[in-house]
């Protein structure tokens, strides 16, 4: 499997413009990335431009804080899928997890899983930099219980990104049948190799072109 085919080619900055998205799409076609990951406002354009290319359209839900209501996340999910999204990366209710309210966290994830209705992969961002190891494990177990397809480390907008240690912990927790996505701070092929060796099955990065061409990007997040 090629490195490119494991990368979600990502542009999530708030000031991203149409020209940036079109460039992202062009690169995704050229390098055959797994998907482009864009904010919901760009899903329709990305879906139109990528139709028939084999490149998926990924978007983000409850992003980047995870603090919207479950009903809002469900609506966002349905809306994104109606516009052509085939993968959604949702942020958990981080405060509820830290409060020990597992029932609320699982219900929040399940709301998105049910809204996706198997029409899109659901990746669950747990924001590892804000969690203890016990909380990371608990978040992963709740994501699996709620029916998610992937667990994911980070938004790229908080205090830290992916680490190989967190990927290994997440992989150990979810087992072999659930995807694990590393995101945040991944800039080089060495970073990617480290994450894959630790158990990642997908990489989120804005530096995809640099990674696959062997360069080094100065961008530390999305």
From Swiss-Prot:
The GO molecular function terms of this record are:
deoxyribose-phosphate aldolase activity
Pathway recorded for this protein: Carbohydrate degradation; 2-deoxy-D-ribose 1-phosphate degradation; D-glyceraldehyde 3-phosphate and acetaldehyde from 2-deoxy-alpha-D-ribose 1-phosphate: step 2/2
Q: What is its main location?
A: cytoplasm
Which GO cellular component terms are attached? Answer: cytoplasm
Q: What EC number(s) is this enzyme filed under?
A: 4.1.2.4
Which residues are catalytic?
89 (proton donor/acceptor), 152 (schiff-base intermediate with acetaldehyde), 181 (proton donor/acceptor)
Q: What does this protein do?
A: Catalyzes a reversible aldol reaction between acetaldehyde and D-glyceraldehyde 3-phosphate to generate 2-deoxy-D-ribose 5-phosphate.
**PANTHER family, alphabetically?**
DEOXYRIBOSE-PHOSPHATE ALDOLASE (PTHR10889:SF1)
Q: Which family does it belong to?
A: Belongs to the DeoC/FbaB aldolase family. DeoC type 1 subfamily.
Full protein name: Deoxyribose-phosphate aldolase
Give the species this sequence originates from: Bacillus velezensis (strain DSM 23117 / BGSC 10A6 / LMG 26770 / FZB42) (Bacillus amyloliquefaciens subsp. plantarum)
Gene this chain is encoded by: deoC
